[in-house]
């Protein structure tokens, strides 16, 4: 799924302050009005007054804060079986006095589509609405038939805000939201404007008491939210979701373990390298410093390199990506630098898509313009696919894969082996006066793109 379409919460790639907005939990002391966030940002209490920790694990992130006798944590994770993000919040009163603490959640909903989210505000500011009922915030993008999200909790809220600007206040930021500062949400909701998910819960913590709250940000309508809330209000189901994720990754790691004299190197290779590879093969580079979610499709070289890394841990996904890349190859032997797999997938049109009814004219892509010419071909793109296929066959033993028939992007079909041969032949033909492979539009270094040069790296890759 591309985050160009149907993104749930807002992402500003070049925001100031940096890395905003997030999925935040604020805490407020009713006695003196002091407030802070469980994660260091956005409130940013001085580090000599509060202790903060952030830990990234396998498919979860935990923030921890120890401030003024309140130890708090917030863990974000997505269960494998449900389209919901769980915010597992725990608070403990470590003092010998009763504490009255208000908890405020906050996330900022988007207008789903990156173009609508960043332009034509005359339209976009009226394209969504929010409502609160049965302790659930429902967010609705009007131009999508199924454009709903919800935000709810396992406890009965004492307040809510559905409007971003009502929660934050005029000329304020996530640093100092007016709702948290005054200690109460305003109950805002509206058809139109910018929306958020904020639920308020007022707690009374006895000395040493610990409480656990679960906030749920999910895909679907209020009815879907009710079902998810019922399920994850049972802490046993939350813990089971953690256990399922843990088992999933332990099974991945068990496929291959590297041992070196350096423990840091072992952790890097066995844990984080595989985790990064698995995430990349699933999501590609859809959201990164390059695209911030605005580039739909697969980068040819990126995906070919991704496929090379996980045939032992995820052979099914490796095979899928290889086939998609083979379909994105032209009969001349170069790959389409950027393409959507569905363009060349014969079964893609059979999938049920969420209809998006744009109020403005969106030009239809002409099929003949999808396949770019040699002038836009990168010399290294398709070469990475050859070793990826070889590694897949070596790991799985599926030698018959080389004889399977796959289509070309510009028409016709051939075996996997024939695709590989065209890739190698293309590089052998695209050489300069010295016999070194041409750089074409660019080799692996996209910044060297003035054309006319030769690439030692591509020549080495071709020989390999």
Please identify what each model-predicted range represents.
Residues 1-303, 315-328, 355-364, 391-395:
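Anionic coordination/interaction segments
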Residues 26-29, 298, 303, 307-434, ...:
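Aromatic-rich carbohydrate-recognition surfaces in CAZymes
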Residues 204, 209, 295, 382, ...:
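Ser/Thr/Asn(+Pro)-rich, low-complexity disordered segments
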Residues 285-291, 365-369, 443-450:
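Short glycine/proline-rich turn/loop motifs
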Residues 256-260, 403, 407, 415, ...:
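Short, charged, low-complexity loops and linkers
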Residues 106, 342-343, 441-445:
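A glycine-rich phosphate-binding loop feature that marks nucleotide/adenosyl-phosphate handling sites
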Residues 50, 58-63, 81-84, 94, ...:
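Hydrophobic, small-residue-rich alpha-helical packing segments that form membrane-like cores
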